[in-house]
Amino acid sequence: MSSGLARGRILDVGEVGIDMRTLPPCDEGRIDPRSWFKDETCPLEIEIGSGKGTFLLQQSELQPNTNFLGFEWAAEFYRYGADRLRRNGRKSVKMAYGDATEFLQYWCEDQVAEVIHLYFSDPWPK
């Protein structure tokens, strides 16, 4: 729970949010992120640099039979975006807090995503 971007409102990432710090060590085997969704058979699309979740919110409405996984490494934006998706009842969307490059390189099974979206990712950590 957090406030900040929400101007005093408590943010709750609920089941939408995934904190990569809670994942098992990457040497314990690869993860298939499709297993995080209710319908694992739907295609998976990944967005890197999800910010406040605007693309995920809009695209999940346009593509209800697609699972979306967004990555954001700025904690405040992650919490705001995941809370926003949760409040809007998006069941086919998850938002991960952490480095997408690290996840895709070390944790994620190969060839699980149909599409990777890169719109406003920040390539330079501050």
Question: Language-model segments: what does each one mean?
Answer:
Residues 105-115:
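A short acidic, Gly/Pro-enriched loop at the edge of an enzyme's catalytic core
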